[in-house]
C-alpha cells in the first residue's frame, strides 16, 4: 500500500485580482473527490485552513507536521491555480519523499481577458524551484480529472513511491562470496551503506551448511516446508530431492 499526501496549491489568496481563489477552492474539492473515486489512499489538508490550500509559510509548517505524523510515502502537488512555488519546494525538501506535479488544463480568458488560473506557468515555476532545491519530481501532463492519463499517472506515481519506500528500508542477504567468474554481480558494500543506507548481511557458506544440516536432522521445520510446497506448488522432484 502507498499513502500519498495530497496538498493543493494556490497563489497567495490575498491577490484575488490575479487569479480566482474561489475557483481554486472549487477545483481542490473536485480533485479530492476524484482521488476518492479512484480509491487513492491520501492525506488531505482541509484541517490546516478554511480553504484546504497551501499558500503561506504558516500553513506549510502545519502541513509538514501532519504529513510527517501520518508517514506519507509520496507528495502530490495539484496546482489549483498558479501555485506558491517556494512553499511547495520547502515542503518537498523537508519531507524527502517522491513528488508529483500536476495541474488542470487552463481555460481560455473571458471577454475581459481575465483568467481563472495559469496552472501551466505555475508548474514551470514550481519545477524550477524544486530543481534549485535539488528535489527530484515527476511531472504529470496537464489534463482533466476524468482523462485516462490522470489515473494512469497517479498509479505510476504510487508504484514509484512503493519502490522508494522499499529501497530505503532494504537489507540484502549475501550468501558466501561472489564466484570468480560472476563479475556482473559485484557490489560496493560501503557505497550502498553510505549513499542509500542499504545493509548487506553476509553469511559464510560453512555456517549456512551447518544450519541446513541441523534443520534436516531435527526434521520438524523441514517437514512443514515440504508439506507447504506440495500443497501450493507444482513439484516435479522426489521428496528427498525437495528436502
Language-model region placement:
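N-terminal beta-loop-helix "entrance" segment that forms/cooperates
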Residues: 42-67, 210-219
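Short beta-strand elements in bilobed, periplasmic/extracellular small-molecule ligand-binding domains
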Residues: 32-52, 136-142, 198-203
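Active-site loops and adjacent core secondary-structure elements that bind or stabilize anionic groups
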Residues: 8-9, 224-243
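Glycine- and acidic-residue-enriched helix-capping/strand-helix junction motifs
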Residues: 14-29, 113-120, 181-185
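Single conserved hydrophobic/aromatic residue that forms the stacking wall/gate
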Residues: 1-5, 9
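Terminal amphipathic helices with adjacent charged low-complexity linkers/tails
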Residues: 194, 199-218
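Cofactor- and metal-binding active-site motifs of prokaryotic enzymes
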Residues: 52-168, 181
Amino acid at each position: 500500500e502507498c499513502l500519498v499526501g495530497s496538498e493543493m496549491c494556490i497563489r497567495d489568496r490575498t491577490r484575488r485580482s490575479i487569479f480566482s481563489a474561489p475557483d481554486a477552492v472549487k477545483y481542490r474539492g473536485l480533485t479530492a473527490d476524484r482521488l476518492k473515486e479512484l480509491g487513492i489512499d491520501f492525506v488531505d489538508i482541509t484541517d490546516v485552513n478554511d480553504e484546504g490550500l497551501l499558500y503561506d509559510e504558516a500553513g506549510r509548517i502545519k502541513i509538514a507536521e501532519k504529513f510527517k505524523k501520518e508517514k506519507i510515502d509520496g507528495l502530490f502537488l495539484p496546482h489549483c491555480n498558479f501555485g506558491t512555488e517556494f512553499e511547495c519546494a520547502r515542503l518537498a525538501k523537508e519531507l524527502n519523499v517522491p513528488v508529483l506535479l500536476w495541474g488542470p488544463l487552463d481555460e481560455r480568458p473571458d471577454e475581459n481577458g481575465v483568467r481563472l488560473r495559469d496552472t501551466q506557468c505555475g508548474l514551470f515555476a514550481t519545477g524550477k524551484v524544486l530543481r534549485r532545491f535539488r528535489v527530484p519530481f515527476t511531472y504529470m501532463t496537464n489534463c482533466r480529472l476524468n482523462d485516462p492519463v490522470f489515473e494512469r499517472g497517479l498509479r505510476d506515481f504510487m508504484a514509484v513511491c512503493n519502490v522508494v519506500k522499499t529501497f530505503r528500508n532494504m537489507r540484502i542477504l549475501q550468501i558466501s562470496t561472489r564466484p570468480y567468474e560472476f563479475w556482473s554481480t559485484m557490489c560496493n558494500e560501503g557505497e550502498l551503506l553510505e549513499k542509500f543506507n542499504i545493509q548487506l548481511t553476509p553469511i559464510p557458506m560453512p555456517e549456512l551448511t551447518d544450519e541446513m544440516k541441523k534443520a534436516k536432522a531435527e526434521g520438524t521445520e523441514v517437514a512443514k516446508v515440504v508439506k507447504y510446497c506440495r500443497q501450493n506448488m507444482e513439484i516435479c522432484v522426489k521428496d528427498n530431492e525437495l528436502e
